[in-house]
Amino acid sequence: MSNFLKIKNLSVNVEDKTIINDLNLDIKKGEVHAIMGPNGSGKSTLSNVLAGKNGYTISKGSIDFCGEDLISLEPNERANKGIFLAFQYPVEIPGVTNINFIKTAFDSNRKFRGLDPIKPGDFLKLIKEKSQILGIPDDRLKRQLNVGFSGGEKKRNEALQLMILNPLLAILDETDSGLDVDAFK
């Protein structure tokens, strides 16, 4: 099996501070990895670097994703190539409904692959099917993205995004952060 994600000699700085120093990691397609370490050891930094978040300087090393130089890609290109980051603290986006956010991301990926946008009825069927699996009520799809959601509702909503977008690589940063009792049901 070929390398799916290969990180070689990666060093990452935030301002003048080295957060990741000379990291090497090989992940083959289909493998599941848990990266563990104390606070400040670079777990979230690695997640953010893989997703292309600004504010990080790669001082050394390379990241190869499915045979392509990941470092040269913009965040939206990384997402369209199949990288998904579930945030430790999902952001609220007032004025944007949950369903519109997910459909926009879904259609953006379809456009990247040369496909037409999904028909609204087909998307509604898909999102309701996945929402039901996760126990997400229909009314939450019409609410503003993560606005007023509990920690568990936000995490469940990210799980819905993950199921709909079906990425090649899912990076789950602090998956238990902000969970409520209902999330454990």
Locate predicted features.
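Short hydrophobic beta-strand immediately N-terminal to the Walker A/P-loop
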Residues: 33-35, 47
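The feature captures the beta-strand-to-loop junction immediately N-terminal to the Walker
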Residues: 36-41
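Helix-to-loop junction immediately C-terminal to a conserved catalytic motif
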Residues: 51
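ABC-family P-loop ATPase nucleotide-binding domains
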Residues: 91-168
